[in-house]
């Protein structure tokens, strides 16, 4: 996905529909596009992605990578450690905290065959107005929608 969109456009796109296989690198790229990603040096991305449709996508894990999830503004947690979670992609559900802290994300369309939504998957998605939960979902994790409006 990174090669197709490129760094020039990734922070400008507001609506995105993806099909095919998505891996952890793609999810990390999506988080950058949505303006919610800090790397280990504290670099921040100012993306504008608000609408994400991954209904035709399959989440895959080919390399067991992990990603640390951090809030958009670390000053919110001044004096305390930033919350973080290990996120693993698999074909059964959304990993823990995979879309956490996407403060400006307004709509997400999940894969049609999704089986579960992980713990904290959408925590602090404060602008979320619409999300589909496919009939195939059998489990929704703890605090999956905590602090969502």
What are these regions (language model features)?
Residues 30-36, 66-72, 123:
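A structural signal for leucine-rich repeat
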Residues 93-95:
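A composition-driven surface/loop motif
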């Amino acid at each position: 996905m990174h090669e197709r969109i490129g760094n020039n456009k990734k922070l400008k796109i507001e609506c995105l529909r993806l099909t095919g296989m998505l891996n952890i690198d793609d999810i990390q790229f999506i988080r950058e596009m949505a303006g919610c990603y800090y790397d280990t040096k504290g670099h921040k991305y100012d993306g504008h992605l608000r609408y994400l449709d991954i209904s035709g996508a399959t989440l895959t894990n080919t390399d067991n990578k992990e990603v640390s999830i951090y809030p958009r503004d670390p000053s919110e947690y001044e004096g305390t450690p930033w919350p973080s979670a290990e996120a693993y992609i698999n074909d059964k559900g959304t990993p823990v905290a995979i879309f956490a802290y996407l403060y400006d994300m307004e709509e997400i369309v999940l894969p049609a065959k999704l089986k579960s939504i992980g713990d904290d998957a959408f925590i602090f998605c404060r602008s979320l107005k619409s999300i589909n939960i496919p009939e195939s979902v059998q489990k929704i994790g703890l605090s999956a929608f905590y602090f969502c409006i």
